[in-house]
Amino acid sequence: MKQTIILLYGGRSAEREVSVLSAESVMRAVNYDRFTVKTFFISQSGDSIKTQEFSHAPGQEDRLMTNETIDWDKKVAPSAIYEEGAVVFPVLHGPMGEDGSVQGFLEVLKMPYVGCNILSSSLAMDKITTKRVLESAGIAQVPYVAIVEGDDVTAKIAEVEEKLAYPVFTKPSNMGSSVGISKSENQEELRQALKLAFRYDSRVLVEQGVNAREIEVGLLGNYDVKSTLPGEVVKDVAFYDYDAKYIDNKVTMDIPAKISDDVVAVMRQNAETAFRAIGGLGLSRCDFFYTDKGEIFLNELNTMPGFTQWSMYPLLWENMGISYPELIERLVDLAKESFDKREAHLI
């Protein structure tokens, strides 16, 4: 009998369009000899919509429901996703997706799910908190200043100019896929960048800009996490923003990255250390800066990296000999393993 994968996609965050792309890639890559796929769309307003079911590979003409094609007659209660024995694959990016909220809901439903748990998801989603945890783990990061809504912005800008040097990058603390990120070359640009970032979150991070290559490492596993050889994001734009990643395709990927064995070893070790420091489970992608001075800075941990056909994470594992369909199978098995352990602890 086939096992059911319940694919959750869409969501309320600014990254909902990325989620649809990831979900369509996953539904086409699943091993349908082993799995049946049932899909549920979470609308921009937060409603749950029961969408397609697939017992065999979908055709090229098959497309998942989006906010533009919603069939409101198929609206269901969020708990309608429950199916005994099914594993949930929450292909949700950003807030209300990979920040622990959906993970908590799935734990209340007593359902296994792919990826990190409540704590590690919420921790990694918040850039400021992640930085503080990684500092305690002894992992190098670029200098930064944290700004919280209600702070004296003028005083904080003065702190930025005292501790950092232009250019700086301003980021919402609780967002991903480069949404709301700006590069600032002077104080006026910084003020505008802060206004943009505060549209997406009440906590904002200002980081020192560095002249660096962007190198990424894939992580797979629970308590025995394994890492990939690094890959490099090769950019044709000023910085790797949302449009460059998902709309304009102005990036290419060099897998494996052309870096020395010593640098590879440090990045893989730091990635695995960071994953353990946050209590990661299932998967993550760890992003590094490798500066022209030879410095290695950990930039962020992404607990639900993109799964589009051009995304770095599946390509990194493909380079390690694990195909896209096999990667999905391993993630499902890891989800069941972590679920069994979580349930065993409830005694």
UniProtKB/Swiss-Prot annotation:
Documented EC number(s): 6.3.2.4
Swiss-Prot/TrEMBL cofactor(s): Mg(2+); Mn(2+)
Q: Where, by residue number, does Mg(2+) 2 bind?
A: 300, 302
> What are the entry keywords?
ATP-binding, Cell shape, Cell wall biogenesis/degradation, Cytoplasm, Ligase, Magnesium, Manganese, Metal-binding, Nucleotide-binding, Peptidoglycan synthesis
What terms describe the molecular function in GO for this protein? ATP binding; D-alanine-D-alanine ligase activity; metal ion binding
Where mainly found?
A: cytoplasm
Listed GO biological process terms? cell wall organization; peptidoglycan biosynthetic process; regulation of cell shape
Location(s), subcellular: Cytoplasm
Enzyme class at the top of the EC tree: ligase
Please write the reaction equations for the catalytic activity of this protein.
2 D-alanine + ATP = D-alanyl-D-alanine + ADP + phosphate + H(+)
Q: Name one Pfam family in it.
A: Dala_Dala_lig_N
UniProt feature coiled coil, ranges: none
Under InterPro entries, the record lists: ATP-grasp, ATP_grasp_subdomain_1, D-Ala_lig_Van_CS, D_ala_D_ala, Dala_Dala_lig_C, Dala_Dala_lig_N, PreATP-grasp_dom_sf
Q: Name one GO cellular component term.
A: cytosol
Q: In which pathway does it act?
A: Cell wall biogenesis; peptidoglycan biosynthesis
Q: What exactly does this protein do?
A: Cell wall formation.
For this protein, the record's PANTHER family field holds: D-ALANINE--D-ALANINE LIGASE (PTHR23132), D-ALANINE--D-ALANINE LIGASE A (PTHR23132:SF25)
What is the name attached to this protein's record?
D-alanine--D-alanine ligase
Q: Which lineage ranks, top first, belong to the organism behind this chain?
A: Bacteria, Bacillati, Bacillota, Bacilli, Lactobacillales
**Gene symbol of the encoding locus:** ddl
